[in-house]
Amino acid sequence: FVRGALPDCGFNMLSIVGTRCPTGEGIKMALKIGAECAYLSLPVVSGLARGIDSFSQRGCVEAGGVSIGVLACGVERVYPRTNIRLASKIISSCGCLLSEYPPFTEPLKFRFPQRNRIISGLSKALLVLEAPKKSGALITADFALEQGRDVFVCKDILYSRKNEGALSLYEDGAVAISSVKDIFENK
C-alpha cells in the first residue's frame, strides 16, 4: 500500500536507520546526511520512527529531496503521531508512505522488526547512523546483509556513547563513512 508517489529510481536510494534516542551529534549527522542525499537526488528510505529515522528524513525533505517512509502500520495510521507533519511533508515532496499492511492497520510491536526487511530491501545500501547494542537498526543491518546490500556506519560519531551497535557492525566489516559521497567511492 502506498500513500503518495513511489519514486521511479529503481534501487538508487539510501536506507538510513538508527536509534530512537540519538545524541546531539547523531541528530546533526542525520540532518546532514539527509540533506546530502537531497543534493545528490538520492531518495532516503527509513521507518519514520522517532530519532535518527525521522531526523534523516526531515533533513532530506527540508533540503528539497524525496523520502520514503516504510511503516509498521497502515499508511493511514502514521506512527508515532508526532510525525504526522513530517509524513505530510514527505508526501507533498513527491515521496511516499509505504506499508505491507492495509491502510488502517494499527502499529503492533511485532510489525516493527518485520518492516525492517523492506527498509533495507528498497535500497542499494544501508547506513546505520547511530545504534546502541540492542537496536532495531541492527535487525535492519542483518536483513541488508542477507539481501546482499552494503552496510555503512558513520565515521564521525562511531565512538559516541550510544553507538556500540554501529561500532560492532564496523568491527564486523561495515565501512565507515563521513559523507554520502563516500558510499559511492566504496562501490
Q: Language-model segments: what does each one mean?
A:
Residues 1-187:
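Glycine-biased, small-residue-rich flexible motifs in mid-sequence functional cores and linkers
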